[in-house]
């Protein structure tokens, strides 16, 4: 009688992960997350643009009650397009958003698994992916904060790390693995600029640590330059228009002090419990003592410390239960990023350089990247050496941290209730970071409404109305000249055109941050105001498109049987 084939432990972890990920697509809770309204409205705005015309959208023309908002120029949205398409064909935004968040978790798991597998094998890969994708940090980003950009960064950080590893630590001759570095960085740029800048800082730090290896193998420098150049080409359609806009327009986000790193560190208790548990403890203390708000603190993620405590114990308890040099390097980076996220006196030193990140515990993303990989390597080592007690303790602690994080999520959801997607408004533009600095009032569009002004000619008559994707101003009885201010937020790339004559008028930034233009050649007419884009925007699309097409062709060519045989 044949013995039944047992499923390996790694296989069981795969099954558990698959079940959790599948359930996530249906059961993602929708509480009042910090950024849920903003990102849900972004998807809705893209869907509305899709109904008007196909293409790459630089302005959400329906945002802010039709005033338009340039979020896509500064915050990549390409990964939202598939889910926006679902909304455009009738899928409910709540369902589309759930699918988006679930797909981020799936992609994070798969990305970590494939990247680690290519270097350390299946056993390490499945453990690293498990610890990474179900880490309290990613759970907080997806389920509590709804920080889509930071969550997407989890997908691409392993690819960046793999690219650096293949270039510097274990280079091949000849090698095209530097492309991984470019793909990872490109994905980060499209996902979240703050995470991109922090990753660049990480790469600089890695180069300093491994400077001897880089100096010994001069080709490494060439590979890095090639990766940087390819990244510029792939992301040109996004980065060049963004830089153009920033060079010509003063924005709300660059005109005001927005950072306070020292006030946004993760406290020590965050190693074990999130702020929601302190809120629960406050309720208990108030019931017993009558003292309200015994613990006063801003929100912070929690339960991310169990893993690092186990790693430190495994490495240093009784001179180390297990040893691994590469794991020690990863541990060093884990501790560094944990310190940056939690030690208040470090923040004033960092403020002048990275104050733009606003929240010190954003660095926990990098902490969990290194900690999950370090833990996976040590777990495999422990299993190989048959040290089962330490092995099981590590997995239990990591899983316990995840359960604690889920518990905090449940408390927040019960307290806040479900987010009513039906109340989404076109005025949901986050903190309004990408308004021009001239717009001093976040609610200006809502308060002013669809009102056009002309202050230098009291005889001209005019009416203003909006259509799909553009606005119109009809005027009559114009003698001499008149300067009109229309209710459209001004960004470089807007066009004002006379429907009858085809004449173009130069749009300028008004004192209120709106589109303003002067007419002095006709007495009446109909003017269209729409976003045409700039030459840089149009050319950059072709640069990125051609680059991606060439990469695909080269990839197919490299996989040809004849080419593969020659390599052998």
Where are the model-predicted features located?
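Membrane-embedded transmembrane-helix bundle of lipid-linked glycan/lipid transferases
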Residues: 1-417, 529-530, 536-568
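Active-site-proximal, structured, solvent-exposed surfaces of multi-pass membrane proteins
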Residues: 3-7, 446-568
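Generic detector of short, locally flexible boundary/turn motifs and exposed helical patches
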Residues: 9, 48, 61-62, 128-129, ...
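Membrane-interface segments at or immediately adjacent to transmembrane helices
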Residues: 415-468
């Amino acid at each position: 009688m044949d013995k039944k084939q047992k499923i390996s432990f790694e296989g069981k972890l795969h099954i558990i992960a698959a079940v959790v990920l599948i359930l996530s697509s249906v059961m993602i809770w929708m509480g009042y997350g910090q950024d849920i309204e903003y990102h849900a409205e972004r998807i809705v705005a893209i869907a509305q643009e899709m109904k008007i015309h196909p293409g790459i959208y630089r302005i959400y023309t329906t945002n802010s009650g039709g005033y338009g908002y340039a979020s896509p120029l500064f915050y990549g949205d390409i990964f939202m397009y598939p889910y926006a398409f679902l909304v455009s064909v009738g899928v409910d935004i709540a369902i589309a958003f759930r699918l988006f968040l679930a797909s981020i978790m799936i992609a994070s798991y798969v990305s970590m698994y494939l990247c680690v597998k290519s270097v350390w094998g299946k056993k390490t890969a499945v453990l690293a992916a498990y610890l990474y994708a179900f880490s309290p940090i990613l759970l907080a980003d997806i389920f509590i904060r709804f920080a889509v950009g930071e969550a997407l960064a989890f997908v691409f950080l392993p690819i960046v790390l793999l690219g650096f590893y293949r270039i510097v630590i274990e280079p091949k001759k000849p090698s095209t693995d530097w492309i991984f570095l470019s793909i990872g960085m490109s994905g980060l740029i499209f996902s979240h600029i703050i995470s991109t800048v922090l990753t660049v800082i990480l790469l600089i730090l890695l180069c300093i640590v491994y400077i001897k290896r880089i100096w010994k193998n001069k080709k490494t420098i060439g590979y890095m330059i090639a990766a940087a150049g390819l990244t510029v080409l792939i992301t040109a359609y996004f980065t060049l228009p963004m830089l153009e806009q920033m060079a010509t327009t003063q924005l709300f986000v660059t005109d005001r002090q927005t950072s306070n790193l020292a006030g946004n560190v993760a406290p020590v208790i965050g190693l074990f419990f999130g702020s929601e548990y302190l809120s629960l403890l406050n309720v208990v203390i108030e019931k017993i003592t009558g003292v309200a708000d015994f613990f006063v603190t801003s929100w912070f993620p929690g339960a991310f410390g169990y893993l690092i405590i186990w790693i430190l114990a495994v490495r240093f308890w009784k001179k180390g239960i297990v040893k691994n040099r590469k794991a020690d390097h990863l541990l060093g980076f884990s501790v560094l990023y944990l310190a940056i996220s939690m030690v208040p006196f470090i923040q004033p030193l960092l403020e002048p350089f990275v104050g733009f990140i606003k929240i010190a515990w954003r660095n926990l993303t990098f902490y969990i990247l290194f900690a999950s990989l370090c833990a996976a390597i040590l777990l495999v080592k422990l299993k190989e050496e048959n040290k089962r007690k330490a092995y099981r303790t590590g997995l239990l602690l990591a899983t316990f941290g995840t359960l604690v994080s889920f518990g905090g999520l449940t408390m927040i959801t019960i307290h806040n209730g479900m987010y009513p997607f039906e109340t989404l408004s076109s005025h949901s533009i986050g903190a309004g970071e990408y308004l021009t600095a001239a717009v001093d009032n976040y609610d200006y569009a809502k308060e002013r409404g669809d009102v056009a002004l002309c202050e230098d000619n009291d005889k001209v008559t005019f009416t203003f109305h909006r259509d799909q994707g553009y606005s119109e101003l009809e005027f009559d009885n114009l003698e001499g000249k008149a300067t009109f201010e229309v209710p459209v937020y001004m960004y470089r790339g807007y066009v004002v055109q006379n429907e009858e004559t085809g004449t173009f008028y130069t749009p300028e930034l008004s004192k209120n941050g709106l589109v303003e233009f002067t007419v002095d050649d006709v007495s009446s007419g109909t003017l269209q105001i729409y976003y045409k884009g700039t030459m840089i925007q149009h050319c950059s699309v072709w640069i990125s498109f051609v680059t991606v097409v060439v990469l695909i062709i080269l990839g197919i060519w490299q996989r040809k049987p004849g080419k593969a045989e020659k390599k052998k």
